[in-house]
């Protein structure tokens, strides 16, 4: 089932937000993010000693007159970042009355919009089974985004997803921006290899875990018949009492804590969001506090 989640009014309200990148930026010239490498922009960064073969037009003759030594001016290189967004389209993302799929699309669309507002490239992929489906491919600029936004609303959710198996064989870039994984991470299939792979490629990794209100704080009590949304062959008949609810909460804390710790150890960002959170709360609150947005 596809989710109609985004409207133009919402995108206009988030236009002023800017994404904050932690790692060095490298890529095609044209974007307006400053990397920590040196290049040919007009913004002065530092000096270094002149060596034979250097461009003499970059010599600082004032420094030579003062120190009787040749110094080369270094400038910040402004390069284009490529934001790559991966959306888990497994059946658990749309299970029951959950709004996880809708939230995933809104977060993906907002991050993509903020990126194109900065003239960065954006690609959006759907994780389906063990492969990626490219929804938006390397667009630059707001006009291109507006022309492609309908594709996000047409994403179909269902089936399984294998995050690592899908991402590892794909082209992920190297040191050229942010990689965002949006999922409920409620799967027996591993995601760790994907995070490690992206981090090793010097990408700024940002994992967003979306859970429904019921998953975060289940209110069900008494006899229940539970169905595994990721495996239709698994069902559970339980009597849910106070102790079961307490054990569930402990298990949930373990799962979310494990992802958080795994990301932190790799200098990756991790966000736990409720499907019922307003996107304004997520972007104007949580992501600003985390330093992902400024």
Residue ranges of predicted features:
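Small-residue-rich anion-binding loops in enzyme active sites
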Residues: 43-45
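A short glycine-rich, His/Asp/Glu-containing loop-to-beta-strand
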Residues: 58-60
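A positional/architectural concept
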Residues: 38-41
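Exposed, interaction-prone extracellular/peripheral surfaces
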Residues: 1-33, 49-54, 63, 72-85, ...
């Amino acid at each position: 089932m596809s989710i109609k989640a985004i409207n133009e009014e919402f995108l206009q309200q988030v236009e002023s937000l800017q994404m904050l990148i932690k790692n060095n930026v490298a890529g095609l010239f044209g974007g307006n993010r400053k990397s920590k490498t040196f290049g040919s922009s007009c913004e002065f960064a530092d000096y270094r000693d002149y060596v034979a073969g250097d461009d003499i037009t970059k010599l600082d003759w004032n420094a030579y007159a003062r120190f009787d030594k040749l110094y080369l001016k270094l400038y910040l290189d402004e390069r284009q970042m490529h934001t790559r967004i991966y959306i888990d389209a497994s059946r658990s993302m749309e299970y029951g009355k959950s709004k996880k799929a809708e939230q995933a699309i809104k977060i993906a669309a907002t991050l993509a919009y903020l990126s194109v507002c900065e003239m960065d490239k954006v690609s959006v992929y759907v994780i389906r089974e063990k492969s990626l489906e490219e929804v938006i491919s390397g667009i630059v600029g707001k006009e291109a985004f507006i022309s492609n936004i309908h594709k996000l609303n047409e994403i179909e959710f269902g089936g399984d997803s294998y995050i690592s198996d899908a991402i590892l064989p794909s082209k992920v870039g190297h040191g050229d921006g942010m990689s965002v994984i949006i999922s409920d991470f409620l799967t027996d299939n591993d995601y760790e290899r994907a995070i490690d792979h992206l981090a090793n490629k010097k990408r700024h990794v940002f994992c967003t875990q979306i859970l429904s209100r019921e998953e975060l704080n289940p209110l069900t009590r008494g006899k229940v018949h539970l169905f595994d949304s990721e495996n239709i062959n698994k069902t559970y008949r339980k009597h849910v009492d106070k102790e079961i609810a307490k054990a569930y909460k402990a298990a949930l804390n373990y799962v979310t804590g494990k992802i958080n710790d795994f990301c932190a150890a790799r200098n990756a960002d991790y966000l736990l969001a409720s499907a019922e959170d307003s996107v304004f709360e997520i972007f104007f609150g949580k992501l600003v506090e985390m330093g992902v947005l400024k």
